[in-house]
Amino acid sequence: MTQPQITVGILSGKEIEFSFPVKFSSSVGTEISGTQKVIYQDGKIHWQGKEYNELSFTPQQGAPAFFELKDVTIGINFHWERKEVQKFKGELKIIIEGEQLTAINVISIEEYLTSVISSEMSATASLELLKAHAVISRSWLLEKNKELRMKNEEFKRTLQKDSAANSSFFIPNSSFIKWYDHEAHRNFDVCADDHCQRYQGITRASTPQAIEAVSATRGEVLMYKGAICDARFSKCCGGAFEEFQNCWENVKHPYLIRQRDSKTEKQLPDLNIEAEADKWIRTSPVAFCNTQDKKILSQVLNNYDQETADFYRWKVSYSQQELSELIHQRSGIDFGQIIDLIPVERGTSGRLVRLKIIGTLRTLIIGKELEIRRTLSTSHLYSSAFVVDKEYEEKGHKEDKIPSRFILTGAGWGHGVGLCQIGAAVMGEQGYKYEEILSHYYPGSTLEKQYQ
């Protein structure tokens, strides 16, 4: 197997503005540089007074070149969402998708990975952490592409809308259970945001360590019994690993299992039990990811990620009005005033898999973890590992058993499946090798080189 090229969808819109600091060759046979703008109109790409179905711009051979894209959104639907100008190596393609244009970056997988590990965390992170992240990002990409490319032709035939895959079932007046996963994009391999893997080209500097990490692990992927691992990862597990089936489809992966994020403290309470989960979440158990070390955190988190100060244990407070309006807005269901939020099922990390919302107008069980997080936040609640306390006003509400305030005390940041980025950063600082980090978070997996 030779090193693959990858196509990355960066942004979409009616108009896309980009620039070339040095000369690029266009697919229509011209050499161009400087600022350019393409516009979607009447089913065509309009550029320099002419119409096209597709355009591509390639750096000239031997020239160190990059292009810039304006108004790229990062952190889509997260609390730190913003737009910025981004820089990319490789080829730029402009295509038509629906009634808008999409900008696609064509780049080698190893160059892509250098950016991904720099975009997912600071490129100044420890070398062993960056090596581990290079392996899991490469594994995720190759495992997904093998599966998704087989589906791609079917998607093109059915013209299914380009979106995150999800499955759900709804039992009227009883339950709404939904999970979200990655699905094939019709016209490119992956997108550039957290839906796939966070990719920002060369916007943020790739340090010699990031380059070394990708080079040292070139072609390496995680394997389990002859298949590439589905190498999931999140920011902070909260001290315990979640299992795959509690977040996505009901399939168990033997390398994504219940375990404590520690080498010294092996015993993990049964967090499926409500009393044990309550105690776990309200305390601060020993774990690799239980750290406030600013040096380590600055290596793992980019500036906008550091806007989240509390991630191992956190609190969110809502007034009755705030919560009832939020749930109504996010779910599209009017529950009336919220009487209670009751855990129905927890996973192996204490994360809620199913949550019962009791209102004055109706009651409904929702899940899985991301649906719960989306329902209880304007973007994404840090995790679904939380317990609920209620406050009552002295007069009025208490007699009606209507809480005046809900306080959520939670653990971790993200789904908690697979590698814990904060925990892995601590392991790297403590001298663990990348192979040891990977075997800790993906027990039973092995390393294998797919290409030279």
Enumerate the language-model features and the residues they cover.
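Conserved, single-site charged/polar hotspot
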Residues: M1-Q452
